[in-house]
Structures are given as C-alpha cells and as structure tokens.
Amino acid sequence: MDLELTGKRAVITGASKGIGLGCAVGLAREGCHVQLAARNKETLRDAEAFVLNVAPNIDVVTHSVDLSLSEDQKRLVNAAGEVDIWINNAGAIPAGDITTIDERLWREAWDLKVFGYINLCREVYADMEARGTGVIINVIGAAAVRPQPSYIAGAVGNSGLVGLTTALGSRSVQKGVRVVAINPGLIVTDRMGHILRQEALDRFDDEDRWE
C-alpha cells in the first residue's frame, strides 16, 4: 500500500518500543524520515537499528528526552524542526483505584502523558498552523471511552485528552492541520503486561493469572 508519505518527516514520542516503535516502523516502510523520542538512550539505539533494518533508505534521528519536563518538551520541538506528522505516544499511567493512587502518582503520570500531550500539541500546532499543513496524532487509549475503576488515573487522563483532541481538531482543519486521536484497545506491550499483572495480583493474589 502506498500512502503517499515518501519524504515526509515524522516525530514519534515513546518510540523506543511498543506502539511507538510500531508506528515508526510503519511510517518508515512508507518512506517517512522518522525521529524517535524516548527517555532511555540504549533502547533508542536498539529502536534506531531496528527501524533502519526494516527501511535502510530513510533517515532516523533519536532524541533522549524526559517528556514529563517542560524544558525537554521544548528541546524536542526545537530539535525536531519542521515536521509533517507528530505522534504523541509517550505515557505511563499506573493502574490502581481511587484509594491506591495518591496525589503524587496522579501528578507524575499526568506530567508525562496529559500535560506532555497538551504542551507538545500547543508547541507543534502553532508551527503547523503557521505553515498551513500537518498532522498531529494523539495515541490515547480505550480507557477514555471504557473507563474502569481499576485504572482510574488513566480513565480520567485519557478522557481529558480526547476532549483536547476533539476541541483542537474541530477548528484545526480550517487551518490545514488535522488533529486526531487513536484509542487502541488491549495490546500486550511491556507496560500493559505490567498493568495486567498488577490487576491480577490485586484481584486474585496471583500475578501469573493476568492472561
């Protein structure tokens, strides 16, 4: 399938593994030059090698950043330059109900995913609007539309991000920019496996019953 993306420039956050790496590989196969952002330099190097093995003729750039920090968010945007596609995917909201997730955990999780998405959308959208072109994709999660009490911080945060995406996207098309959300269902990434094991431990006192 040719999606007519050859030569386009894309940034993917949370790109060293899981859904983010899958997005990077898919775009690279379509001829996109990709920039991968994540915290861990070692896993970023592995991701870069993996993408280049799949698509050796595209450019791959890596950025080691902590996207829970506003200064790193701005540093990434400045380093990335003009891009055609921006995928917000970085986030690690812990499982737990209202009694087990304290304020510190809420804030730490939301600094990365909720405020990370908000701040990056604001920075990236302004540039895309000025150029009259671009796509922002927010990878959010099914908890936004199927909230569960055992994942309350994610349910609330994801619902807010759907609101952000819907509100921004409703006017962005008039400026030549598309802002859309993807709410993936259950995909057993490393992080989701950890969440499922924690839920199994809470419910059955046996983390091996997560499957």
Residue ranges of predicted features:
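A short, exposed helix-loop element centered on a Lys and neighboring polar residues
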Residues: C121-R122, T166
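Conserved Rossmann-fold SDR core element
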Residues: L27, V162, S172-I187
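Catalytic Tyr-X3-Lys loop
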Residues: D84, A92, T99-I118, T133, ...
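Alpha-helical segment proximal to the catalytic Tyr-Lys
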Residues: A126, S170-R171
